[in-house]
Amino acid sequence: MAVIALDTPQGGARVHLHPAAHPIAALMLGHGAGGGVAARDLTAATKVAVDAGVSVALVEQPYRVMGRRSPPRAPVLDAAWTSIVEQLAAGELAGLPLIVGGRSAGARVACRTAAATGAIAVLCLAFPLVSPSGVSRQEELDDASVSVLVVQGASDRFGIPEPDPERSRSVVVVRGDHGLKSDPIAVGDAIAAWLMVVLAQIG
């Protein structure tokens, strides 16, 4: 594992790069609003992806590198993320088909920017379908026009998205809440099965 510092227009970002031995694709994952890249579901995703031949980049947004817990507005997050994707795609992850994703707020960023980053698929861990004030974020999820996997806790207080075969969106519900800490094995199994399908399509 290597830690890479990157500059973005929004400040310095940090990337934890877990390279596969013989990578056939890359997976970039963002953290939740107040959390970090050591979240249990991100750890599970990293392990199964690397085992499947996918190099993983866990991205710390600039505001977290600065020590802040509260995220900036969506356009700021999206701009920083897009800058990081572009730099990695031209550098450490050059030539690899790109899968993007994240947990909670990181999943929202990945969905909103999927088209701009040229992602072939999106992995959403604990996608917050409804905001704390009750506002639906369905449109953000629908913005991702590629294959999408949502892994959601059965008791997630922010709701559970519906699968949509027409949009190539599948949803796997596992034991637990928004933290997805209760059953990391089930989380990993769901991701591994989905990755097999995604990777077969680019093979």
Regions found by a protein language model. Give the residues of each.
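Gly/Ala-rich beta-loop-alpha elbow adjacent to hydrolase catalytic centers
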Residues: 102-110
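Short beta-strand/loop motif that positions the catalytic acidic residue
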Residues: 143-145, 150-152
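A conserved short beta-strand
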Residues: 118-131
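Serine-hydrolase catalytic machinery in alpha/beta-hydrolase-like enzymes
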Residues: 4-97, 109, 173
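Short beta-strand immediately N-terminal to the catalytic nucleophile in serine-hydrolase-like folds
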Residues: 97-102, 125
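Conserved alpha/beta-hydrolase "acid-adjacent" motif
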Residues: 37, 153, 157-162
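Catalytic histidine-centered segment of alpha/beta-hydrolase-like enzymes
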Residues: 176-189
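Hydrolases whose catalytic domains are alpha/beta-hydrolase-1, hotdog thioesterase
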Residues: 109-113, 133
